[in-house]
Amino acid sequence: MPWIQIKLNATNDNAEAIGDMLMEETGAVSVTFLDAKDTPVFEPLPGETRLWGDTDVVALYEADMDTSLILQQIKASNMLAEGFAHKVEQVEDKDWEREWMDNFHPMQFGRRLWICPSWREVPDPQAVNVMLDPGLAFGTGTHPTTALCLEWLDNLDLTGKTVIDFGCGSGILAIAAIKLGAAKVIGIDIDPQALLASKDNAARNGVEDQIEVYLPKDQPEGLVADVVVANILAGPLRELSPIIKGLLKPGGQLAMSGILDTQAESVAEFYRDDLELDPIAEKSEWCRISGRKLG
C-alpha cells in the first residue's frame, strides 16, 4: 500500500524532539533522520541519536491520514519557525530489506581487501575477502568512517599482532584484521546485538576461534593490544580517551573514526600528549585520526 511522507528541516538541537512529537502527537508510524545532504544517519549508540547540524526529519504516515491536519499539529507545537519548510509526497510500499540487499555490492578497500555481502559471489577469490551480513549491527563498509578504518588496516602489517576493535558493531573491522594477518582480535561493544552479529560474521568467515567479543564490563583486566581501532563517535572518543589509550601497548598503533571534519581537532587534542599523530585523513566530511603511542 502507498504511504505519505512528510519531510521537515531541523537542527541537531531540536530534531530528536521533533521526531518524538511526530510519533506521539501526529500518528507517524516511523521517523528517520537524514542530514540535509541526504546522507543517512549511521551508528547511533543505544539511547543516543546521532545528528548533523542541519538535519531533515522524515515522517511516514498511513495513506488515509489528513496531511493538512498533521501540518496544523506541527505548527501548533511551536517547535518550528512560522512558515516552516516542508515537503509532502506519496511513496509506494517496497520490500525494503530486498532493496537494501540488492544495492549492497562487493567493495574494495586499499590494495588487498574486499568486503562482500554473504549473498553475493566474491569478485576476486585470491583477494582478502570478508563475507558480511551486518544484521542489526552497524558496519557494512558503505559509510566513509568504516572505509577509512578498513583502508588504514589494509596498510598495516598485522602479522601475528593482537588487535582491539573498540565498538565492534558487525565485526567488519575485527574480521578484516584477522584476514589481514592478525593473530587475535578482541571486539568490545556496549550493544549485545553487536556482539551477536560479530560472532555470526566471524563464524561465516571461519575466524571465530581468533575473535573474542565482550561488553565493556566483561572485558579482561589488563587488556592491551598492538593495534586499536575505534570507529564510534567524537563524544565517546573524547570522554573515553584514557580508556582507549590504556588499551594500547607502548609503540602500538591507534585509529579512530566516526568523527566529522569539524570535530577532528577537538578529538585529537585528547590524544596528542600520548601519541605521535599522523596527518588527519578525510573522506566525504568524515575523518580518521591515527597515530603511534609514545613510550
UniProtKB/Swiss-Prot annotation:
Any single GO BP term: methylation
Enzyme class, UniProt record, top EC level: transferase
Key words, A-Z: Cytoplasm, Methyltransferase, S-adenosyl-L-methionine, Transferase
Residues engaged in binding S-adenosyl-L-methionine: 146, 167, 189, 231
UniProt cross-references to Gene3D superfamilies, sorted A to Z: Vaccinia Virus protein VP39
Molecular functions (GO terms): protein-lysine N-methyltransferase activity
EC numbers on record: 2.1.1.-
The reaction(s) this protein catalyses: L-lysyl-[protein] + 3 S-adenosyl-L-methionine = N(6),N(6),N(6)-trimethyl-L-lysyl-[protein] + 3 S-adenosyl-L-homocysteine + 3 H(+)
GO cellular component, one term: cytosol
Localization, UniProt: Cytoplasm
InterPro entries assigned to the protein according to its UniProt record, in alphabetical order: Ribosomal_L11_MeTrfase_PrmA (IPR050078), Ribosomal_PrmA_MeTrfase (IPR004498), SAM-dependent_MTases_sf (IPR029063)
HAMAP family: Methyltr_PrmA (MF_00735)
Function (record text): Methylates ribosomal protein L11.
Family: Belongs to the methyltransferase superfamily. PrmA family.
Protein name as annotated: Ribosomal protein L11 methyltransferase
Organism: Vibrio cholerae serotype O1 (strain M66-2)
Gene: prmA
